[in-house]
Each structure stands twice: as C-alpha cells, then as structure tokens.
Amino acid sequence: MGPWWALWLILTLPQILESQISAMSQGFPQMTSFQSDQFQGEWFVLGLADNTFRREHRALLNFFTTLFELKEKSQFQVTNSMTRGKHCNTWSYTLIPATKPGQFTRDNRGSGPGADRENIQVIETDYITFALVLSLRQTSSQNITRVSLLGRNWRLSHKTIDKFICLTRTQNLTKDNFLFPDLSDWLPDPQVC
C-alpha cells in the first residue's frame, strides 16, 4: 500500500465508521444535544449484546458497573468493574468526543500501532434512569457490534428493556448474542419497535 493510499484510508475511515453508526441506529431519533455533565457518574451495565457473543459465553460475564468521569475537553475516563468469583476485575479507557452529540471514539493510543478503532454512540438516554449505547469496532478480520443497556439503579422498566431489544434487532443481533439479561422468553411490545 502506497503512502497516498494509506493517507486516504486514515482520512476517510473515521467518516465511514461515523456514517455506519448513523445508519445502524435507524428507528431511534438522532440526538440533537448531549449533556456530558448529566451523563457522568456511575452506571450499571444491565444489558449486553454483541455479534461475537454466543450462549456459551454467558457463564463468563455478568452485570458490572461502569463509571464515567468527565475530564478536560469533554473527554470521559471510563472505568469498569466486574466481579468474577472472589476477584474484582477492572479496566479503563478514555472516550474522546466526536462531531455528533453523544458520539465518541475510544482512545487506543496505549494499545500500540494498528489498534482497532472503536466508535461509541449514546443512542438514547434520560440521564437519570437509563442509557442505550451502540459500539462499532473494526478489526482486521471482522466488524464487532455491541449494544449496552445502562441503568442508574438495578431496576428498569419493561419499556426500557423493550427499547434495548429493539436496538439489538436494528443491529441484526439475535437472542443468542445476548450475554445478559437472559431474554430468551421476552416478547417486546410491538408498539415500541
């Protein structure tokens, strides 16, 4: 690959991934503003679906907490904590705001050259109860789509869970792609989707 081709790829890939998020969140209104100061704080990850997950992965992961700390330049330092047996695993990363409200790019500077690019979009939130988050990551071998359902407490309304299911459907995710909660018998309200 010549230098001009590499330059073209570097300059156009962010726009391509950004347009994928817009197209892939169809059926949900585009955010016109995003209040970072209201979004910051502790959230519980109560729903997680991913096109690379399978039913057999459910035993490996469970509900976890995530803390969004607002830093300078409207960046978020994100710290996740999950218990596995008697251990608590934590991992962190930085989200850099993109051009659209509620859209971010995951900072991979410490990951070395050729690190995967990940675009993250808050699709919908009321800031006090729930948030629906869509993540798209391009690796060298596949596109990874992840949908997360965040809650400020451990209980969510049926309508919110229905919205989560509807968003996963727009991403062509099936019930087999759900890590949690187990929604194999859940039938969402057809008026929500």
Swiss-Prot record:
The keyword Endoplasmic reticulum does not apply. It comes from the Eukaryota. It holds the Pfam family Lipocalin. Its main location: secreted. One of its GO terms (molecular function) is retinoic acid binding. InterPro entries: Calycin, LCN2/LCN12, Lipocalin, Lipocln_cytosolic_FA-bd_dom. Keywords: Disulfide bond, Glycoprotein, Secreted, Signal, Transport. Disulfide bonds join 88-193. Expressed in epididymis. Glycans are attached at residues 143, 172. It is found in: Secreted. Residues 1-19 form the signal peptide. GO terms for cellular component: extracellular region. Belongs to the calycin superfamily. Lipocalin family. Monomer. Binds all-trans retinoic acid and may act as a retinoid carrier protein within the epididymis. May play a role in male fertility. This is Epididymal-specific lipocalin-12. It comes from Mus musculus.
